[in-house]
Amino acid sequence: RAIGRNSSLDMLPSKRAEFRSRGRFLLKADVIRFYPSIYTHSIPWALHGKKFAKLNRGKELLGNEIDELMRNCQDGQTNGIPIGPDTSLLLAEILLTQVDQKLSHRRLKGLRYIDDYELVFDTEAEALAALSKLEEALLEFELHLNPSKTKVVPLPQQLEDSWAAELKSMELLPGSHKFKGQLIRFFDRAFELARSFPTENVLKYAAGRMARMRIWIYHDEMAEDLLVQCARVEAGALPAVLASILRNPKRASRRTRLLKELLHSIIMEHAPQRHSSEVAWSIWACLALRLKLTSRVVRPVLQMEDSVCALLLLHARALGLLHKPKDLDELQAFLTPQDLYESRWLLSYRRHPRLE
């Protein structure tokens, strides 16, 4: 990424141990639908002050210019900014740093990781009072806490999710003769934990641990089969699964039938639900593995009206990976200058190298 973080998720348990030693009650809270609910007009409020920005709406203010650019990215909508780009991460920090600033006089103990808050207090009353002030500070920027994830609990509490701690502690030694048995036990437990914690990304975590291994472990098809199962059940695990499988492209190319079935099934399942990330990763994997896309797979992707997925299809056509290249002819309609300001502006912007 172009923008990094000072702390990774792996560092959270040790940081929690440090600040939780300073109180008896823990306030946990996060912002509901954070990126989709960001009000673009609040960007100049955060950069220049709310009162000043409301009195000065011209482009001479950087915040107003960013506000307009964000609206142009979202079909003119004032609610929501794109999820994923580093620019959005930076804008999120600009907003929530101002929220932090409004609370700084209270000398709070704890941390904020993106939009997740964990703060400690000596008494429950202090925690509830701080919760009220946090809600008030967020409301100034049109943001709200998620009531289902906001709570005050007595300390001590677990430093990390029990399922994550268990999977992290399981031994996996790729160079050992015991590795095959370790692998079976690891994924058996991961599948069991995924059923016990259906709202958590258990299989994504399991696949991610495999992807971080430095030694090539795919001498055995079983490892690949287990990873494919993870992606079939939890499509969010697909990037980590692909990172593992594509580490050995020659081996991946020998299992094209299995991978084609996986990727096509993910596209067919998630395209009608407009799950852009899952579909985009699947199409990208087809490009990387040179797997052809049938009309049956392409049609629901076009109906998503998603520029990133459409551009990936155009790249597939350029590589000769579409069974029917004419399936994409309808994208020619998005070539007018006006389309640069509509919801599919990215497709229009990139039209020349792909459509002409």
Regions found by a protein language model. Give the residues of each.
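Extended, Lys/Arg-enriched charged tracts that mediate electrostatic binding to polyanionic substrates
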Residues: 1-7
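Conserved polymerase palm-domain catalytic core
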Residues: 14-114, 119-135, 141-143, 171, ...
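Conserved catalytic core of two-metal-ion nucleotidyltransferases
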Residues: 84, 141-172
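Catalytic-core helical/loop segments in enzymes performing group transfer/polymerization on anionic/lipid-linked
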Residues: 9-11
